Amino acid sequence: MNIHFIVVGQKMPGWVQTGYAEYAKRLPKACTLKLVELPMATRGKSGSVAQYKAEEAKRILSAVPKGAKLIVLDEKGQELTTVQFSQKLDDWLGSGQDVALIVGGPDGLDSSLIQQAEWKWGLSKLTLPHPLVRVMVAEQIYRAWSVLQNHPYHRE
């Protein structure tokens, strides 16, 4: 299974690339994490937030592989424990489908995209910076994988 981690925004600091790469490389071929960076909509004086989000939603949907489960990160999404998330990962692995895990731009995701999602994942009630989210998601996927494999990385 491939997890296509589709994010709006580019040019992350070096520490983000290093942290993300560290956790992504720890995952086995049976559960690969592939980063897909998309440019933000160009902000201008005449545009609106709704227009920017709609433009980004089109880019996101064009990057989602055919047949992939659509999962969005959303501040109002379901928050899970590590063990609960590992069960979610196990379900994804068992389905045989790829997963498209979506992070929107600075203005969030278009509501039409959120409505299309099979699941809405909330990392925290806190507002988190996009660079940190990239590393956290990669780490949580690796942690969930380690729980499924009874690897000592995660401790209860």
Curated annotation (Swiss-Prot):
EC nos: 2.1.1.177
Binding-site residues, S-adenosyl-L-methionine: L73, G104, L123, S124, K125, L126, T127, L128
Key words of the record: Cytoplasm, Methyltransferase, rRNA processing, S-adenosyl-L-methionine, Transferase
Cellular compartments annotated: Cytoplasm
Record keyword Membrane present: no
Gene Ontology annotations for the cellular component aspect, listed alphabetically: cytoplasm
MF GO annotations: rRNA (pseudouridine-N3-)-methyltransferase activity
Catalyzed reactions per annotation: pseudouridine(1915) in 23S rRNA + S-adenosyl-L-methionine = N(3)-methylpseudouridine(1915) in 23S rRNA + S-adenosyl-L-homocysteine + H(+)
The organism's place on the tree of life at top rank: Bacteria
Enzyme class: transferase
Family annotation (Gene3D superfamilies): 3.40.1280.10
Pfam families according to UniProt: SPOUT_MTase
InterPro entries recorded: Alpha/beta_knot_MTases, RlmH-like, tRNA_m1G_MTases_N
Function field: Specifically methylates the pseudouridine at position 1915 (m3Psi1915) in 23S rRNA.
Subunit structure: Homodimer.
PANTHER family cross-referenced by the UniProt entry: METHYLTRANSFERASE (PTHR33603), RIBOSOMAL RNA LARGE SUBUNIT METHYLTRANSFERASE H (PTHR33603:SF1)
Similarity field: Belongs to the RNA methyltransferase RlmH family.
Protein name: Ribosomal RNA large subunit methyltransferase H
